[in-house]
Amino acid sequence: MTEIRYVRLLTLVLASSVLLAGCSSAVPTTPVRSATPSAAATPTATPVVPPTVNPAATASLHAAARSGDAEAVRSALAAGAAIEDRGEGGRTPLVEAAKGNHVEAARALIEAGADVNAKDDIQDSAYLYAGAEGYLEILRMTLTTGADVNAKNRFNGTALIPASEHAHTEVVRMLIAAGVDLDHVNTPGWTAMQEAIVLGNGGAGAQDVVRQLLAAGANPDIRDSRGRTSLCNATRLGFGAIASQLRAAGATGC
């Protein structure tokens, strides 16, 4: 009886050992990764595809701008021309159109978003060309679409200075209304008033320019690079009518 109990007990012990060995030899599991990406993951950037530019259409755009063909300008733009492409002399199509006073071609370019402040190799923009040459309609378009009214040309002068020199009276009126700096001094040492006198002819146009500038508050007593005031120069050059205007405004002589 004792022997039988011993055999049963031994059998139970062996069975328990087998079970414990099976538990301890379980295959380790691989950690399961979350299906949700971590917050630090960087999304893949979508490549930026540049817009297609048509070189032939761009060449046609320059030609159309130079000749003033507004319809050809629109066709070239629709065909993929680069509106800010630089051609001869660093001129954009808009600068080319403005330089030739091609109003409708310039309008088509401006309506398409051309930069009215883009300058060519000699530092002239569509706005500056229009002011210097007296192209009133192009000047108006550039002013109403963001032209920098105090942009400077290669002589460090505003559009008002050459406009005054050439007695473009309506341009002068428009620039004054736009808020241009009346007393800016360019590299040669002249304000708009000085240039109207020194490089003008003293005629009716120059007189009107001086009158407008005085009425707008321009300072007639600023001296040029030789130390001469506007009245001094008007007197020296024999422009009696302008000298009288300046005296009436209380200007200082030499």
UniProtKB/Swiss-Prot annotation:
Residues 1-22 form the signal peptide. Pfam families: Ank_2. Keywords: ANK repeat, Cell membrane, Lipoprotein, Membrane, Palmitate, Repeat, Signal. InterPro entries: Ankyrin_rpt, Ankyrin_rpt-contain_sf. A lipid is attached at residue 23 (S-diacylglycerol cysteine). This is Putative ankyrin-containing lipoprotein Lxx09580. It is found in: Cell membrane. Its main location: membrane. GO terms for cellular component: plasma membrane. It is a lipid-anchor. ANK repeats lie at residues 56-85, 89-118, 122-151, 155-184, 188-222.
